Structure formats: structure tokens, C-alpha cells
Amino acid sequence: MVMTRSLAVILLGLLCPAIPADDWPQYLGPKRDGVWRESGVSLDTPPRLLWKTPLGGGYCGPAVAKGRVYVADRRGKPVGSVQLPKGQNPNFVRESLPGDERIVCLDERTGKIVWEHKYDAPYSSVVLYAIGPRCTPLIHEGIVYSLGAEGHLLALSADEGKVLWRKNFVTDYGLEMQEWGTAAHPIVHKELLICTVGGKGSTVVAFDRKTGEEKWRALSAPKPGYGTPVIEEINGLRQLIVWDSDRISGLDPDSGKRHWYATFRPSFAMSIGAARVHENLVWVMGFNGRSAAIRVTENNQSTKFAWVPSPKKGVAGVMNTAYLRDGHVYSGGRRGQFRCVDIRTGERLWESTKPLLKANGSGRGAWQSAFTVHHEPSGQTLIFNDHGEMITASLSPNGYEEIARTYIIEPTHRVSGRMLVWSHPALANKRVYCRNDKEIRCYDLSKK
């Protein structure tokens, strides 16, 4: 029997189907763990720019689902701003700034706008950081969920941008707007959309994800904080972990009932990074040298610190979520150091300034940050520093080894005398999607 070449190719394709590409439908990826599981990519050669599309300002990263890219921005109105009471420190000066927030849907292949939805959103937060939305859109079963910087929560149809339901955390729940706006990414759990909201008895609220009907509310705190809630299994029990301005709490995600809590107050309520969990240890970190590991008891009813919190232990990263692997935390932290820490002891195994500086060694500044994504197939880690560089590195408890570095996007936001970009990229379909306050870019990372 003679088999033609074309028939052989067809049969091979049937027997060995292509590995499906992965979407990135929410903050930190499909499983909200900062891990990219897609193979067939090259991480040690400069990526090829496929397209770029103009955007307004914003910290929120893009999300990718079913051939579309979703991102949010703000276009301010410079006329008509009203001065609010000022403080001494520019990091706390607030004004009322007119402007619109916008949710944008792009074609993944071309970057062309498919639809957009904008709404009035005057800002009342600190002017220096009143750039745009903080939260990456979440796409789940045909619905896009977007949370703006002033507490506007919208659910829209993913295909055409039709508003299905909406909430306003200020008018609906009495949220007193925090200095740096609302920044905790919503998450989906079963039929619920769970959000950090604010207001009396409503630090965290669960909505019916299809209708917006409130299903439960829980906790009170002076401020809700900025950290994204997470759902993890501890001692065999799935738990919702929330860090507000007063404490870390473990809740039943179905009902909002609290199992345990630990008092640990982040400076200025800056609980930005999402909690990470290893076995029965819950890791949190924040501004001003604050980091800790909380040990949850076997009955899931009480806690104790695994080690005494100290500025000399932990990482204390500010704008990013740490990456946790095999009991070791990797993150940018205080004083421009990227660190590896043993979560069980708080001991710093090593630290390096290289990932947080530019390729030429310059660029030291305040609140240096980096977003870390582990690439599971290669065992390598991608580090996106706030200079607009993408670094490929090998991270282990033994040290930091840099493999490649590429400049992918211009830093456009000025803070403390330097330009930076604080936006988590998306990694999907062998591509990286990144944005600043001027544009969104798409690069090809596929292996040739």
C-alpha cells in the first residue's frame, strides 16, 4: 500500500492533535496562580511585535479569551477639576478629576477595536496615581466583569459589550473611597462573583455572577484594602482569603462565614499583593517592610504567626503578587531587591538588584516592582520589571540566573522622579500582551 505525503500528514494530525493554546482570562492567569502552562514558545530570543493599539491611562493588565483581548482605560477631562483638601505629601494629595473610564475589546489577531463601552467616572483618589483602572477584566462564560478605580463594577456581554448589570460600591454600599481607589480584582467561584467592596459589614460581597443579585456580605474594616481575594485549600477545606486594613480572614466562599482571622495591619491599608498559600501557611506582604506567614490550625478555627514579622525577614513587595513554589517565595521587595524567602521561617535565602534595574544597571528608585510569571514547561520564570523590560530567568533557592532580557514597552507614568509601568501583562496563545498609558502591544513568542 502506498500512502501519499498529504494523506500521511492528515493522519498524523488526527493521531497527534495540536496542543491547545491557553487563554489568559483574568489577573494572574487561568488558575490565578501566576503560572503559564503553554508550550512551543521561545523565551530566550527577542519577541516580534505583531501590533499595537492606542489606549488611555491605566494600571489594569489585559485579559485574553476566545480570540479577543479585553482591557480598561481612562481618558481624563482636564477642565473642571475641583481641588479637595490637600496634605503635605504629594502621595496623599486628592482632587476631583472629571473623566471617563472605558472597557475595550480588541481582535486578538489584529489589535483592532471590536467594541468599547465608556461611562462617566470622576476620580477622587490621590492625583499622582489617578491614571486609570487598576483591575484586569475577568472573562467567564461569555461575560466580562470590569471594576473601575472609583468602585464602578460592570458585567457586560463579551461578544458585543452590552451591559448586563452594574453596581456602584460608593452609592450601593457606602464605600468611603480609599486614597488609591479600588484595586482588588474580582474573582469567580461557582455561580458567584466575589469582590472586595467596603462599607459597614461589606468588606467582601458575593454577587450572582449572571444577575448581580447580592448573595452574601461579610466583614467590616476601616478600609477594604487593595488586595485581590483568593480561594485556596487549607487543611482539606476550600477557603476564601481576604486581607483588609485590619486583618487576614479565612471565609467559606459559599456563605461568607468566617473560619479564622489574624490581626496584621498593612501600612496605609496597602494590602496590594494577593495572598499565597503553601500547605497551611498563608503568605502576605505589603508596603513599609510588612510581610508575614500565618499558620492556620488543623481545625481551621485559629491562627498563629509562623515567624515574628520583621523588616529583616520576608520580602515586603508593594505593587505585585509574589510567586510561590515549593515553599519558597520569589518577589521584588524593599530597597530595590528581588528576593527568595523560605515561607516557613521568613529567612532570606538570597537577594539581587538585577531584575529591578535596567539592563545597564541604572534605574534605582522608590517602590520598585516586578510582575513574576512562571513558565511551567521550561521551568523558567518571566519577570516584567517597571522599566518595561521582560526578563527570562532561572529562579531557585540557590540563586538568580538571568537568561535573556528584552525591552518591550515604554514606561509612561512618572512617580518620584522616574518613569515606570505598573501593569501586569497577559500571556496567551504564544504571545505576550502589555500596556502602558499610551498603547497596548502584542508580541509573538512562538518557537520558530
Description of each model-found segment:
Residues 6-18:
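Bacterial N-terminal signal peptides
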Residues 19-448:
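Noncatalytic, solvent-exposed loop/strand surfaces
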Residues 1-4:
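N-terminal secretory signal peptides that target proteins for export/translocation
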